[in-house]
C-alpha cells in the first residue's frame, strides 16, 4: 500500500487528490494557497481537507522514522528475521509496531532478566512446550548457588513466562479489547487534601465509562492528579476472569505445568500487562482529550480573530483603572498614536469633572469617531462616564454620533510588555501601549490580536494541560487561515500581520515593511518582486492574499490571483468592454458563459471564485462592528436576581456550554442543556465567540462566584 493510498483511505478521499496535494506541499505551496488557487489539481479540496492531508502525512512520516529506528535496533541485536522485518515494514499501525518491538526493546533490569541471567530460560520454555512433564523434576536440573532450590527455580521460570505473556501480541490485543469495551475511569481524593482540592470536589469519588468521559472532565481529573489532589485510574469494570482469559492460549488444561503457567499468567496480568495497557489507554484518552480541547480552542480563536472590525476610524482608546487612573489615547484612521494622557474620574481621586472636560477636549481636537473602553477593572464605571457626555450640551462635539464600545482586554497586558509593543512604542510605557491595543482591537481585531500569543487571549479550555506542540501547531494554522481568509492591506499591514500571509514568514514580512518605508506605498502587486529576497515562488504564494486599495489595476484589490489577470481581461475583451466596466456591471458578467473559458488548469471552481470576487471586489468578509450595551442596572454579582433577562456577549465556548460576559467581573455559564429548547450536542452549533445574546439568570452562587444562565425561550 502506498502512502498516498493510505492517507486517501483514512480521509475518504481519492488517491489522485492526495497525490496532487502532497506534490504541491512538497513544491513549497501553502495550505491557504492550495485550497484557494489549486482547486482543479486537488479536486476542490477545502482548507480543512488540505490541512488534514498534511497532518496525516506528518503522522505517517513520524511512523516511518519510528519503524526505521525499530528495525535498526532489532538488527543490532542480531534478532531481526525476514518475517519480522516484513511485518514491521508493512505495518501502518503505530500500536502494532510497538507490540512487535516490545520483546526487543531495551528495558531496565527486570525479574525475567535476572532469571535469564541465572540460566532459567530453558526451564521456562520447557514448562511452556512440554507442560505434561513434572515441573519440579525439571526444575531440579537448574539448581545453582544463585538458584538454591526448586521453588526459586520455578519462581524464576514463572517470571520469564510472565514477561513473555505480557509481551505477546495476542495477550496485549485481547486486553486492549477488554479495556475498549469495559474500561472505567475513576478518581478519588488523596487523603488529607479535602480543603486544598475543593475545586475538584466533583471528582472526589467519581467513575464513568472511559468511552463516555468528555474531554473537559478527563482533563480536569488529570490536572487534579498532576497537582497531587486526586488519584486517577483506568481499569475494566469487572476484572474477574480477565487473567484467566489472558492465560488460556498458554495453558493446557490437566497438564502437570498448568498451575505454574496459570500463576505466571495471573502475575503477568496484575504486575505487567494491566499497568501497561492502563498506561496506554491513559495516554490515548489524554491525546483524544487534548485533540478535542485544541479543536475547541482553535474554533474559538478563529471566531475571535474574525470578529467584525469597525474599520478605519479616528478612535479614542481608554484603558480604565481606579487608583492609577484611566489611560486615554487618540489614534488616527491608520491606528497611529496622536496623543495620550491620564484621567482620574474614579476612586480615590474622583476628579470626574476634570476627566469629562479632558474627554470633551480630546474628542474635539482629534475629531474622534468612536470610543473603545477596556472591559476590565473600572470598565463599566468608565463607560458610564463617557455615556454621560451624551446628555451634556456641547455644540462642538456631537456625542450622539460617537459609538461607544467595551472591548475585551484579554492579552492586552501581555502585548504591552512584549518585544513587538516595545518596538512599536519604544518611548511609551506599558499603560499607553495597552490603551493603544484596546483601540486598535476595535478598528481591526485580526491585525491587533495576531501580535499576542493566542494562549493569552482567554478562549482556551485547559490550554495549559494539553500537548504544547500540538496546540501551537493548531493555533498557528488558525491564525494563518484567518489572515489569508480576510486578506491583508499591503500598504498598511504590520510586519507581524504580514508574517502570517501565505508564502512570507518573518524575514520577508520585515523586508516588505522596510521596502515600503524606503520607497513609499506599493502601487501594484507586481512591485512585490522588487522586495529583496522575494522571488517568483514567494510571489506566487502571497500575491493573491495581499490587497492594494485604489491600485491602478482593479484586480490588485481582490482575491483574484495575478496569474489569472490575463484570463479576466480576455473575458472583458470578448464581451466588448474593459476590465473596470466588467467589474462595475454584473449584467455584463451574467451574459458570459464561463464554460468557454475552462481549461485543464482553470476549471469552473476557480472561475466561480473569480466571479464571486468581481461581485464584491475588496469586500471584507467580517462585516462591521455593532454597538452593544450591557444592562445599566447591573455592575456586580450582587445586582443579579433570579429571573433577570440580560444582554450579554459570548466570550468562550466549551464542550459543556458557553461563558457569557454580563458586564461584571464574573462570567456566567450557559450549560449546554440550557442553550436552546432542543437537544444540543455541540454548543458551537448554537453560539460562537463574540456573539451578542439574551440570557436569563437561573442561579447565583455568590460564595463560589458562579452564575448559571439560560438561553431557553420556554
Locate predicted features.
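Generic start-of-chain signal for non-secretory N-termini
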Residues: 1-19, 26
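A glycine-rich phosphate-binding loop feature that marks nucleotide/adenosyl-phosphate handling sites
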Residues: 177-184, 318-322, 376-378, 407-414, ...
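Structured, non-catalytic alpha/beta "coupling" segments that mediate domain-domain communication
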Residues: 73, 87, 98-101, 224-239, ...
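Single-stranded RNA-binding regions, centering on S1/OB-family and related RNA-binding modules
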Residues: 548-552, 556-714
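Duplex nucleic acid-engaging cores and interfaces of nucleic-acid transaction enzymes
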Residues: 49-52, 59, 63-317, 323-428, ...
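Short, ordered loop/turn segments at secondary-structure junctions
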Residues: 37-39, 128, 237, 320, ...
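Long, highly charged, low-complexity intrinsically disordered interaction regions
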Residues: 3, 61-79, 89, 414, ...
